[in-house]
Amino acid sequence: MPRPTGKKFDKRRQQQNPLFKRKKFCRFTAANVDHIDYKDLETLKDFIGENGKITPARLTGTKSHYQRQLDTAIKRARFLALVPYTDQHKA
């Protein structure tokens, strides 16, 4: 059975997700960062999702070199209780 290639199919493809059309770039490369520090909580919180997971590089545009450093820094900050493991605590 052939794949649908009509106008209806093309319209669906164009409307899929307009939020991810912006060009992704590595914030750390643009700022000439040598090392990501675990004490810089404002930067780390930008890369942690709503549920406490580390946002993957394919969504943020971070290069793999900096993604590994970011991963280590977030885990160190969590271990030292600077950043919570999850954001779903009931107070």
UniProtKB/Swiss-Prot annotation:
Cystine crosslinks: none
GO cellular component: cytosolic small ribosomal subunit
Alphabetized InterPro entries for the sequence: Ribosomal_bS18 (IPR001648), Ribosomal_bS18_CS (IPR018275), Ribosomal_bS18_sf (IPR036870)
GO biological process, one term: translation
Single GO MF descriptor: structural constituent of ribosome
Alphabetic keyword roster: Ribonucleoprotein, Ribosomal protein, RNA-binding, rRNA-binding
HAMAP family to which the protein is assigned, alphabetical: Ribosomal_bS18
Family: Belongs to the bacterial ribosomal protein bS18 family.
Quaternary structure and interacting proteins, as annotated: Part of the 30S ribosomal subunit. Forms a tight heterodimer with protein bS6.
Function, in words: Binds as a heterodimer with protein bS6 to the central domain of the 16S rRNA, where it helps stabilize the platform of the 30S subunit.
Protein name in UniProt: Small ribosomal subunit protein bS18
Lineage, uppermost ranks: Bacteria, Pseudomonadati, Pseudomonadota, Betaproteobacteria, Burkholderiales
